[in-house]
Amino acid sequence: MRTYPIADDINIEINHIKNWIKDYFVQNGPDCKAIIGLSGGKDSTVAAKLCVEALGKDKVIGVYMPQGKQHDIDIAHEVGQYLQIQTFEVNIGKICDTFYESFDNSFPFDNVKENSVVTSNSPARIRMSVLYAIAGMLHGRVVNTCNASEDFVGYSTKFGDSAGDFSPLSDYTVHAVKAIGYALGIPAKFIDKAPEDGLSGKTDEDNLGFTYGVLDTFLETGVLPEDYEVYKNIMERYKRNIHKVKPMPMCYRVGPCHRENWEL
């Protein structure tokens, strides 16, 4: 298994990411803006800060997307004010309700609103649709804010928060993202905010059944968790969810594959 060690000098990592972001925009739209959903958590805050430092604050747009009344949306607003970037707010509450209600009279199964798989994943996909709508109108590129820890155990929604045009943090564990955030001078209240699922009131770690500290030690060093049940939980989640981060399998034609020649 590959591990995810970070440089002894975190500034080496920071400069690497900023240069990578700059190069991405040179190659994929020098006039484009970075469009990022701001939740008030560490990942979106750190990713947005890196984009601001790489591109300038005038080329970064933050989007708040509460679902109805959201108790922690004020923290997201504070992040936007801290970054001094242009922001928009789109409340997805009514969009979600309309989406669920569209199944009421035509769907031959249980009440969609009571299906936890639907209600936990649909808002993330709707938020991503909002980001791409804004990106389409403003000539932007959508920032993916997932980290390596979440990706390894599949703690994301396929085509939801796992989507995006470029992903500056996907090779960094939660531990590394926090270290980057502190080194960037981001206020601790944004970095230390415990991530929640936004539905049950539980933290991510409550839902996972282990801490990111244990997971990150495993990912960064390869040292197995002392508790075998935790290790088994981690690996079962990895095997069950790896499809979320792998490219979509494709059936290639018999004979020469023309897609292989698309790279000019």
Task: Describe these PLM feature segments.
Residues 44-48, 73-77:
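Short, surface-exposed alpha-helical segments at coil->helix boundaries
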Residues 41:
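Conserved G/P- and acidic residue-centered "switch" motifs that form tight phosphate/ATP-binding loops
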Residues 1-36, 50, 58-61, 67-68, ...:
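ATP/NTP-dependent adenylation/nucleotidyl-transfer catalytic domains that generate, transfer
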Residues 126:
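His/acidic metal-ligating clusters that form di-metal
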Residues 53:
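Primarily recognizes the serine-hydrolase "nucleophile elbow" in alpha/beta-hydrolase
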